[in-house]
Amino acid sequence: MDSLTSPLLPASATHDPDPMATPAEIAAVIALAHARRARTLVIGSGRTPHALATARRIDSTWTRAGGITLATITWPETAASWLRQATRFVAPAPDLWVMTGPTTGWAQMTRRLLWSTPWPPTHTLATATLAAPHTLTLVGLPHLNGLTGAAVDGTTWQVKNDAFIP
């Protein structure tokens, strides 16, 4: 696996769409968490209106299903380093992490997590907004092996063997 040469993206931030997760997508994220026998989650999201609403919906659905949310962490689309957010994201040591939000902020946060923390993609679930090939290549597929997520229709996807598997 090629190492990241910097936790920051080489290009400046863009203004990405801010889609809301569908009910089927949220149900699939919760089902994936249950299938992995998770009891605790940390939910991370961008700070856009739909990302925040999606994080709240995941939290409430998870809690109603008997799970425990240890923390909800947000990150900006642009920042100097994302180190503070990355440190707060991994500190509670949940069974699983869940991530949602616009592309650029997620990519920057994920690169910082890989660069500065013991965060493993194998213990992370993501929403459909993060499944686009151009999004995943901002971080690099070899760095995301094991990342699993839900599509808008409730089907699931995974990064495995350096490839996106729908």
Predicted regions and their residues:
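Long, C-terminal catalytic modules of enzymes
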Residues: N161-P166
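Flexible loop/hinge segments that line or gate small-molecule binding clefts
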Residues: M1-D16
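Short acidic/His/Gly/Ser-rich catalytic and metal-binding motifs that mark active-site loops
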Residues: G46, Q158-V159
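An alpha-beta-alpha
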Residues: S12-T74
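Extracellular/periplasmic bilobed ligand-binding domains
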Residues: A51-W157
